[in-house]
Every structure is written in structure tokens, then in C-alpha cells.
Swiss-Prot record:
The keyword Hydrolase appears for this protein: yes
UniProt-recorded name of the protein: Chemoreceptor glutamine deamidase CheD
Organism: Bacillus velezensis (strain DSM 23117 / BGSC 10A6 / LMG 26770 / FZB42)
Family: Belongs to the CheD family.
The enzyme's E.C. designation: 3.5.1.44
Amino acid sequence: MSRAEAAVVKVGIADVQVARYPDKIRTSGLGSCVGLVLYDKDKQTAGLVHVMLPDSGLSKTAELNRAKYADTAVKMTIDMLLKAGCRKFALKAKLAGGAEMFKFKMTNDLMKIGPRNVAAIKEQLSLYNIPVISEDTGGSSGRTIEFEPKSCMLHIRTVKQGETTI
């Protein structure tokens, strides 16, 4: 497949996908949500999950969307990458999002979904010994992210802060 034929794999809200070079992988609409990229550099393969909430215990339905919650999304993404030929010991993580989109007068941590999402994802990653290589989290701006599996670069666009790469 030539570089001109490369596709951009789109990841929706509470969704997970896997992409292999030359394809890229992208998600948008990251406010308090977190985009977690897990990748194996040598295999030039990455998984991207758009996590909405920290804990599946918050689910109000019997049918659980595992990509929606940090405590289930990390394992789901790891499993998908292993099926795609990645090696667990080689997985690394990058993440973006977790903003506080709305300021509340209350100091109730329950309302701080963004920081709770980031903390829950990091907790899960530590259980699997997956290092966080870089992150762009917090703040009050929404983000769109795109990951390139060959260079392992995560491109981040925000309305207020412009573009950055980690």
C-alpha cells in the first residue's frame, strides 16, 4: 500500500479501533473524555480508545459498552492489539484529553470527570505495567488527536492552544 493509499481510521465516542502503518488513527470531541493510544513501535500498530467515564460501575444499563469506561477499555484495547500481533511487553501509552470543560462552584470531585478519567486510565495502565510516554491532559479545551503508528507521534489540535505533537 502506498502512502497515498493510507487511510485515517476514525474512532467514535466510547469506541475503540486498531490501525497499522501506513494508516493513521483519529478521534475528536475529547473534552472530559480521554483518548488513550496504546502502541507497539516495532509492529507499527496502535489502538485508540475514546474513554468517556472512569468506572463501569457508573453504567445504568445491563449491556456494557466496554470502550466507554476506563476500567474496562484499557484491557479491551490491549486484547485487540495482542490479536493484531502486538507484544504486551512492547506496549506503550500516550494520552490526551481529560479537560474540565465546565467550572462548578462545588468542589465535589464527582463532578471532575476529566481528571478522574485520567487517573483511572493511569491506574489501569499501571496494573498492566504499560508506561505513559507522554500526555496532554487537563486544562479547559477540547481536543482532536491523530496518531501515526510509524513515527509514534500523537498530533493534538485544540481551538484555544492550536496544535502540538507529543
